[in-house]
Amino acid sequence: MNSDLALLRLLQLASPGLPVGGFTYSQGLEWAVEAGWVRDIKSFSAWQREQMNDTLAYLDWPVLARLYYACKADDADAFARWSRFLLANRETAELRLEEQQRGAALARLLDGWQLGQAPAWRPSLELSQLGGMAWLAVHWSIPLRQLALGHAFAWLEGAVMAGVKLVPFGQQAAQTLLRDLGEILPGVIDQALALGDDQLGGGLPLLAIASSRHETQYTRLFRS
């Protein structure tokens, strides 16, 4: 696949139009706003920076790399192992359910394209969205670093759009946040992709608490 087509496929994977429910989750932000932990643009930005540096950099993006390499090596056992590792590191029932719901949605999309149907791969593809993205990236010849950057921006855009509804702030502020927080992503991605297996795993206690409390929050805009 030529580089232009690979870029277009990456944009498709990172698009908010990808039918995996990306904008239906707040990942604890809804409770954090209600609790007063996030109350303005400054505290929202700090909340997202913490997630990028302490969770995504040590879990999501290095695991994405391992899923990608497993697909390139046609190693279904390694793919299954890292898919389970990712799910096990989701600290709340809500976050685990979100991961599985996103994974199942992307797996259904693959079904429609008659891709990823081998019995050794199909059950693992349902466990996480990252697994399906890695599988498609290898199938479409998308380079790993570009895939990680695409996933990172899609995550950031989803978080900022949730902030627009919850904090709230306007579209000008949202675009400024995307610009400023986006500047951090290349360096964080480089750090994440350089980690060894024994360095993986990260979590934020406040995020876990916020997600747990969101499960029983009385009034919610976002899915639990």
UniProtKB/Swiss-Prot annotation:
Of the GO CC terms on this record, one is: cytoplasm
TM spans, by residue?
none
State the superkingdom. Bacteria
InterPro entries membership:
UreF (IPR002639), UreF_sf (IPR038277)
A single MF term (Gene Ontology) = nickel cation binding
Its subcellular locations are: Cytoplasm
Instruction: Provide the alphabetized UniProt keywords.
Output: Chaperone, Cytoplasm, Nickel insertion
Describe the function of this protein.
Required for maturation of urease via the functional incorporation of the urease nickel metallocenter.
Q: Which HAMAP family match?
A: UreF
Quaternary structure?
Answer: UreD, UreF and UreG form a complex that acts as a GTP-hydrolysis-dependent molecular chaperone, activating the urease apoprotein by helping to assemble the nickel containing metallocenter of UreC. The UreE protein probably delivers the nickel.
Task: Tell me its family.
Answer: Belongs to the UreF family.
Which protein is depicted?
A: Urease accessory protein UreF
What species was this sequence derived from?
Pseudomonas putida (strain W619)
The opening ranks of the lineage are: Bacteria, Pseudomonadati, Pseudomonadota, Gammaproteobacteria, Pseudomonadales
Q: Which gene encodes it?
A: ureF
